[in-house]
């Protein structure tokens, strides 16, 4: 299993950091429905973190967060037996590097591969990959029997950010709606830089709908 204790410890650390950086307290328990601010047109980063710290915080090596869309970690990406059992046809690796992830790793499985060389840093511009990743996910799920694993090292930040962007771009979810949908199935915690980029996407998409 994805180490739930590790994820909770990370959330607790970030919550403490947020409290020292903002007057708004970070809530680490409760249900998503208890969040009074989720109906606000746009949340700020600290409010989004409060939302992320509520509800489900555990995760497996991979969790189906949308029909046919699995969000997971590097261990699942390396497990050919599990990929075959789940019927995975596509893999999107958000932590691609020279040493981690190649199309050749899936030779004989009939899996199509896309690598995104992203760093889990607030300074990294993930937004340049939003559309390409969303298009790849959409193509995977549009084919008969298509199933996709979107992963990074742990499956909670880089890959989660790309999944959220996909739901926003192709299914017209707001960012809050996308977070709640994914968190119904898996704990996630995109870094603050990624949250700001998703907020910018949220504003752009909603302004386009209102135009």
From Swiss-Prot:
Residues 60-207 form the Tyrosine-protein phosphatase domain. It is found in: Cytoplasm; Nucleus; Golgi apparatus. Its EC number is 3.1.3.16, 3.1.3.48. Keywords: Cytoplasm, Golgi apparatus, Hydrolase, Nucleus, Protein phosphatase. One of its GO terms (cellular component) is nucleoplasm. InterPro entries: Atypical_DUSP_subfamA, Dual-sp_phosphatase_cat-dom, Prot-tyrosine_phosphatase-like, Tyr_Pase_AS, Tyr_Pase_dom, TYR_PHOSPHATASE_DUAL_dom. Interacts with HSF4. Inactivates MAPK1 and MAPK3 which leads to dephosphorylation of heat shock factor protein 4 and a reduction in its DNA-binding activity. Belongs to the protein-tyrosine phosphatase family. Non-receptor class dual specificity subfamily. This is Dual specificity protein phosphatase 26. It comes from Rattus norvegicus (Rat). The lineage of its organism: Eukaryota, Metazoa, Chordata, Craniata, Vertebrata.
């Amino acid at each position: 299993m994805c180490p739930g204790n590790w994820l909770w410890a990370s959330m607790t650390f970030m919550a403490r950091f947020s409290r020292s950086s903002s007057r708004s307290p970070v809530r680490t328990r409760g249900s998503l429905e208890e969040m009074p601010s989720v109906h606000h047109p746009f949340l700020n980063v600290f409010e989004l973190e409060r939302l992320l710290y509520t509800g489900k915080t555990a995760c497996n090596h991979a969790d189906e967060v949308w029909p046919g869309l699995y969000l997971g970690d590097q261990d699942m990406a390396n497990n050919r037996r599990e990929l075959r059992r789940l019927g995975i046809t596509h893999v999107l690796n958000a932590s691609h590097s020279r040493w981690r992830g190649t199309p050749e790793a899936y030779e004989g499985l009939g899996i199509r591969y896309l690598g995104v060389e992203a760093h889990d840093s607030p300074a990294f511009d993930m937004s340049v990959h939003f559309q390409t990743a969303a298009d790849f996910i959409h193509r995977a799920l549009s084919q008969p029997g298509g199933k996709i694993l979107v992963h990074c090292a742990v499956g909670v930040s880089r890959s989660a950010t790309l999944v959220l962007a996909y739901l926003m771009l192709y299914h017209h979810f707001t960012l809050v709606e996308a977070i709640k949908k994914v968190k119904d199935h898996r704990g996630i915690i995109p870094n603050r830089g990624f949250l700001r980029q998703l907020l910018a996407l949220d504003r752009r998409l909603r302004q386009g709908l209102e135009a």
